[in-house]
Amino acid sequence: MIQGSTSRPIMQPQTLQELCLDEACLIPTDSYTRLPWTLKDQLLKKLTRRGKCTDDIFSWLIHSRVTELDLHACLISDAGVEYLKTTKCLKVLYMPEPPVVENNNFSENSLMGLGEGKSMLRVVALNGLCGVTDGVIGSLVGGCPQLQEVHISSTSITNHALTALANLTQLVCLNIGKTQISDIGIQQLVSGGVGQSLRELRIDGCVRLTDDSIESICHCCTHLNILCFHHCPRLSDRSRELVDEYKAWRMKQLTWTVY
């Protein structure tokens, strides 16, 4: 009888393809331009996952058929953003964010063109970048009318950005935490089609919001099941009571702070 045996996870050996990709990561970057786009795509994914994608590498590997880019751990600059103009098939984009880059690493001018010609874009994350302004969001909404997820916490947006976002009738998830929005902006956001489509809303750390915002959300966002409004010092117990009255029974995630 065997006692005390323990199971250990078995390490899977790398495939030949993975080994070849690891070797390809080591070749001179100017050789990347001669690679087929399918191989460029795999190299791009591997390097971005490792946070090894720089402006130089980006310039050689980016191509028009790219559909997903997760750059949150990559150190690129305005020059790298320029290369994104060719990615007309892009569906998912996560931009670099602090502390990997400085919050002012990307200028408003470079970000203004981010949504041009990207009608297929569904998910975009621009968290922590002060270059993200109302103008940038307006341009993004104009070029990407089918956006479903927008993550723009800790940016420079105001209520004007929420007015633009209110036009995204397919918007399901919105993160606008730690911004200078107010009750008026929230009311403008949820009073239209967005109120019917939103499933997740994160407004944590928005110090200008009051109970009026929570009331608007509870009345208008009929399908909401994730709501985060912790660290909002102007909210009172009334907000929690409103959520209990209208939404608590259907919530999957709910966070708030008692002051």
What are these model-predicted stretches?
Residues 1-6, 16-19, 160, 171-176, ...:
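C-terminal capping region of solenoid repeat domains
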Residues 62-64, 85-88, 109, 116-119, ...:
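Inter-repeat linker/turn residues at the boundaries of leucine-rich repeats
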Residues 49-55, 73-81, 99-109, 130-138, ...:
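Short, solvent-exposed loop/turn at the beta-strand->alpha-helix junction
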Residues 34-41, 128, 154, 205, ...:
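Short amphipathic alpha-helical segments embedded in low-complexity Lys/Glu-rich regions
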Residues 1-75, 79-82, 87-89:
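Cullin-RING E3 adaptor/co-adaptor recruitment helices
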Residues 17, 21, 25, 44, ...:
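Amphipathic alpha-helical interaction motifs in eukaryotic regulatory proteins
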Residues 67-71, 93-96, 122-127, 147-152, ...:
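Conserved hydrophobic beta-strand positions in leucine-rich repeat
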